[in-house]
């Protein structure tokens, strides 16, 4: 049987010094034969999705101790993409994913932890911890902080979120008073932003991967029911330890759960729920850590056969995460996908022998368990707060209308093809991605003139100065993993296009990426990026660009001779922005850029460059 990793520092005469230090942390004689379980907490007061996590690690720790484990908590960083948005702070967001992954690895391996509980929530934190968990391959359970409640104001007919505040701020016809009201109302509670943005998308995907408990992605941060997820996670991680170290059960390990089939299931869910395009980036990165063969080719194939079964903000103002939960959460969607023959339900999860078993219990459309029905009636209280588990409001009924409700059956899908697509062509030889769930059908085929900007800042200035006209394709380049560096999100450009009334009349193309809050014809992750010699670096103002989502094509409409000449000129000039940009790139960012791969590889670091 596998021996506890922690025995390296807790067993034998020569470890007296290490045990002395362990004792100084509170361990007693009877603790040295128990599993030492690391709790990676991402509490910070900078991020609303994490501001309520301070005491939750200790909540899990006490539960671990009750069932025979030793819990040791540590913290890692968390960047708020919304606060970092629109300035050089965004250069640090994606690289922070690697820092988070490394920090979890460092702590778990330096102290020989036997297992891991990951308390995450927002955009790069869940992916970073996921990468670390799959890299370490020790028993793990994910439990996130949960989504915030949607905002409400008498000045809007629909519920609000962060994007509404951004859009209204750029609307010159809106009064300062209206902007202030939206600002005060858009983010009323602690939790990850209330739509199907990157944070909530990733927390939902941990359910589909089998690494978190049902409800992890959709139970509100403020609701008392969420406390049970943390308590159950504490008990479950000790059970997983016993299954691995006591029984060598491979399905107690993350790589035994997050197999290729599980990654396909997670991507199927992502496509069906119209998740953030960032999830593609993060799943590709996680698959590499798990040593699973899963790339853009697999995602492209899935996108052609998986329908869209759920439509949530920013793709519609009608529904937010609280509505997804009322409709059955992730397992409501997984149940419909399973009945459509679109999932491998034989894969295990941390909490069930198989996904099929989990669906039978947790899908409200088929479950007769009254506790499950009650669980998914957990709803918002409409009270501004930063306190976790502070309310116990329940919807009077569930939304199980699979014809016209928030979650649809395959027969009544929002669209026959899902919410994400991979495009290829001479402008993106290695691929690019678009969230089709947020694109109006009238512009699924679009051709227009290029309006080229060498940075996000320049594009924002140009859009606000009315340089962009209806029919244009805005091209923002040298914002990829290497060229940015850091692959900035482009929420401000897309929000400002929307505020100018151009959301359905323009396209935006970039080697950067988009916030989960983005909608419209926004195409990101163009690979190769400009800094790596990608064709996007050859585009000039006025060039014609054709986008054909049904055909999965994106092309720069130039002859090969012209492209060859431009490429020769770029080789001679160097693949760098043609206009100066006031951007300070620190040594930390330079180190990331030196190793960064393109988006089609997950923007992970190419550590092969470091040698053996």
From Swiss-Prot:
Top enzyme class: lyase
Name of the protein described by the UniProt record: Dihydroxy-acid dehydratase
Cofactor(s) this protein cannot do without: [2Fe-2S] cluster; Mg(2+)
One Pfam family linked to the record: ILVD_EDD_N
Binding site for [2Fe-2S] cluster: 122, 193
Reaction catalysed by this enzyme: (2R)-2,3-dihydroxy-3-methylbutanoate = 3-methyl-2-oxobutanoate + H2O; (2R,3R)-2,3-dihydroxy-3-methylpentanoate = (S)-3-methyl-2-oxopentanoate + H2O
GO term, biological process aspect, one: isoleucine biosynthetic process
Residue numbers bearing the N6-carboxylysine modification: 124
GO cellular component: cytosol
Cofactor binding: number and manner: Binds 1 [2Fe-2S] cluster per subunit. This cluster acts as a Lewis acid cofactor.
Residues that coordinate or bind Mg(2+): 81, 123-124, 489
Membership in a protein family: Belongs to the IlvD/Edd family.
Active site: 515 (proton acceptor)
E.C. code: 4.2.1.9
MF-aspect GO terms: 2 iron, 2 sulfur cluster binding; dihydroxy-acid dehydratase activity; magnesium ion binding
Pathway info: Amino-acid biosynthesis; L-isoleucine biosynthesis; L-isoleucine from 2-oxobutanoate: step 3/4; Amino-acid biosynthesis; L-valine biosynthesis; L-valine from pyruvate: step 3/4
InterPro entries: Dihydro-acid_dehy_C, DihydroxyA_deHydtase, DiOHA_6PGluconate_deHydtase_CS, ILV_EDD_C, ILV_EDD_N, IlvD/EDD_N
Subunit structure: Homodimer.
Function, in words: Functions in the biosynthesis of branched-chain amino acids. Catalyzes the dehydration of (2R,3R)-2,3-dihydroxy-3-methylpentanoate (2,3-dihydroxy-3-methylvalerate) into 2-oxo-3-methylpentanoate (2-oxo-3-methylvalerate) and of (2R)-2,3-dihydroxy-3-methylbutanoate (2,3-dihydroxyisovalerate) into 2-oxo-3-methylbutanoate (2-oxoisovalerate), the penultimate precursor to L-isoleucine and L-valine, respectively.
Record key words, sorted: 2Fe-2S, Amino-acid biosynthesis, Branched-chain amino acid biosynthesis, Iron, Iron-sulfur, Lyase, Magnesium, Metal-binding
């Amino acid at each position: 049987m596998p021996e506890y990793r922690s025995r390296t520092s807790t067993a034998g005469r020569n470890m007296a010094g290490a045990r002395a230090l362990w004792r100084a942390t509170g361990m007693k004689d009877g603790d040295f034969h128990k599993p030492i379980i690391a709790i990676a907490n991402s509490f910070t007061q900078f991020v609303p999705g994490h501001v309520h996590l301070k005491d939750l690690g200790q909540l899990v720790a006490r539960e671990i101790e009750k069932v025979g484990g030793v819990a040791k908590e540590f913290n890692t960083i968390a960047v708020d993409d919304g606060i970092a948005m629109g300035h050089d702070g965004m250069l640090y967001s994606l690289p922070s994913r690697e820092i988070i992954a490394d920090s979890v690895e460092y702590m778990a391996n330096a102290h020989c932890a036997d297992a891991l509980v990951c308390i995450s929530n927002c955009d790069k934190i869940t992916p970073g911890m996921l990468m670390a968990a799959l890299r370490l391959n020790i028993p793990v359970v994910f439990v996130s902080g949960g989504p915030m409640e949607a905002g409400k104001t008498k000045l809007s007919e629909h519920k609000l979120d962060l994007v509404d505040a951004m859009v209204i701020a750029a609307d010159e016809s809106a009064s300062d008073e209206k902007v202030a009201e939206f600002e005060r109302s858009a983010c009323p509670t602690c939790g990850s932003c209330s739509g199907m943005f990157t944070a909530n998308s990733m927390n939902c995907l941990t359910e589909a991967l089998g690494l978190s408990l049902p409800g992890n992605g959709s139970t509100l941060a403020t609701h008392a029911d969420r406390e049970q997820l943390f308590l159950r996670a504490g008990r479950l991680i000790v059970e997983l330890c016993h299954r691995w170290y006591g029984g060598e059960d491979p399905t107690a390990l993350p790589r035994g759960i997050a197999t290729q089939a599980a990654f396909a299931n997670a991507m199927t869910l992502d496509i069906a729920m119209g998740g953030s395009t960032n999830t593609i980036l993060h799943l590709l990165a996680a698959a590499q850590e798990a040593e699973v063969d899963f790339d853009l080719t697999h995602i492209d194939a899935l996108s052609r056969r998986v329908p869209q079964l759920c439509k949530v903000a920013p793709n519609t103002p009608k529904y937010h995460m609280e509505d997804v939960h009322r409709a059955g959460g992730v397992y409501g969607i997984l149940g419909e996908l399973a009945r459509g023959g679109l999932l491998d339900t034989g894969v295990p999860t941390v909490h069930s022998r198989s996904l099929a078993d989990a669906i039978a219990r947790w899908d409200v459309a088929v479950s007769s368990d009254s506790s499950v029905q009650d669980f998914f009636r957990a709803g918002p209280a409409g009270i501004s707060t930063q306190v976790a588990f502070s309310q116990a409001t329940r919807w009077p009924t569930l939304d199980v209308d699979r014809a016209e409700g928030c979650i649809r059956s395959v027969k009544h899908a929002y669209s026959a093809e899902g919410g994400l697509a991979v495009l290829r062509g001479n402008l993106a030889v290695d691929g690019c991605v678009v969230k089709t769930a947020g694109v109006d059908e009238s512009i699924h085929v679009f051709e227009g003139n290029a309006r080229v900007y060498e940075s996000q800042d320049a594009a924002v200035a140009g859009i606000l100065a009315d340089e962009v006209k209806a029919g244009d394709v805005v091209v923002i380049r040298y914002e990829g993993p290497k060229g940015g560096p850091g692959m900035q999100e482009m929420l401000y450009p897309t929000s400002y296009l929307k505020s100018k009334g151009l959301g359905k009349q323009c396209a935006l193309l970039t080697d950067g990426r988009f916030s989960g809050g983005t909608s419209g014809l926004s195409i990101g992750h163009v690979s190769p990026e400009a800094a790596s010699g990608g064709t996007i670096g050859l585009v000039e103002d006025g060039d014609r660009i054709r986008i054909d989502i049904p055909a999965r094509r994106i092309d720069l409409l130039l002859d090969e001779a012209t492209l060859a000449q431009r490429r020769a000129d770029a080789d001679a000039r160097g693949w760098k922005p043609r206009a100066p940009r006031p951007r300070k790139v620190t040594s930390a960012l330079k180190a990331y850029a030196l190793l960064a791969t393109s988006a089609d590889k997950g923007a992970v670091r190419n550590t092969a460059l470091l040698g053996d």
